[in-house]
């Protein structure tokens, strides 16, 4: 879940102070290890001192994990509130990570990165195909030739099956009740998210939207942006995705020349 340009200006401003509590059970360390495994399979291993770009970094949890491993990390996110949380965490941990408030569909960074990552279905928040194409092109321009982009998406099936409809367990610091509705014509899932903070009895509602993209569309957009080859994996495995996959990871290698 994260922070890329959609029709809503900052869907994460309200939840930013509680985001880490909401994601407390997410095994970020295991995610970082899985990403490292995929990068190794692509022939671009993540070493100490690798320059890594964390797209839609949110509160910076993944970026900080890679910084702990010795990487030179830059994290970008559209949400000012999330970036402020990331900067606060980095300062508390004494981590040297550059966090920037930038739009995935409109950023320009020098071609100095070995790897770029974009996790937790952040790219599904790009509701217009042209914005996803621009995000891929911008990322390609920020990568060295042979660098890799590793990202995950919610599959068409995941949004069609309305898997966002869920509640979390009792006794948590942030309670939520989410109801999703998928429109097959627009291919957009609208998720009404009701939150309750028991410690303060604060209650609020936010609306998130995600768009589904087919494997063929993603591969076409990546090719146009200058990525080849492209590999796909069932989430958290190193086997190909299947018809019942809910989340797919892509590993796209930057070709020798940037697309125009």
Model-derived features with residue positions:
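Residues lining the SAM
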Residues: 119-121
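A short acidic, Gly/Pro-enriched loop at the edge of an enzyme's catalytic core
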Residues: 108-115
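C-terminal lobe and adjacent flexible extensions of AdoMet/dcAdoMet transferase-like proteins
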Residues: 215-260
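Conserved class I S-adenosyl-L-methionine
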Residues: 1-56
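Class I SAM-dependent methyltransferase SAM/SAH-binding core
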Residues: 53, 60-106
């Amino acid at each position: 879940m994260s922070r890329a340009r959609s029709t809503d200006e900052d869907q994460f401003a309200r939840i930013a102070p509680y985001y880490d509590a909401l994601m407390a059970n997410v095994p970020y360390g295991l995610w970082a290890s899985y990403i490292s495994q995929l990068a190794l399979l692509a022939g671009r291993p993540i070493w100490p001192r690798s320059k890594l770009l964390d797209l839609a970094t949110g509160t910076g949890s993944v970026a900080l994990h890679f910084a702990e491993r010795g990487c030179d990390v830059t994290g970008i996110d559209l949400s000012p509130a999330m970036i402020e949380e990331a900067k606060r965490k980095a300062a508390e941990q004494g981590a040297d990570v550059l966090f920037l408030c930038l739009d995935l569909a409109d950023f320009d960074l020098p071609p100095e990165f070995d790897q770029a990552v974009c996790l937790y279905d952040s790219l599904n928040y790009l509701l217009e195909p042209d914005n996803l194409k621009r995000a891929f092109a911008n990322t390609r321009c920020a990568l060295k030739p042979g660098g890799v982009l590793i990202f995950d998406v919610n599959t068409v099936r995941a949004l069609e099956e309305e898997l966002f409809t869920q509640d979390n367990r009792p006794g948590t610091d942030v309670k939520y009740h989410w109801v999703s509705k998928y429109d097959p014509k627009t291919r957009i899932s609208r998720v009404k998210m009701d939150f309750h903070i028991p410690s303060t009895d604060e209650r609020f509602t936010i609306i998130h939207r995600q768009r589904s993209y087919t494997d063929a569309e993603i591969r076409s957009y990546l090719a146009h942006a200058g990525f080849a080859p492209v590999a796909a994996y069932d989430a958290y495995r190193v086997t190909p995705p299947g018809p019942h996959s809910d989340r797919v990871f892509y590993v796209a290698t930057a070709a020798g020349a940037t697309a125009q």
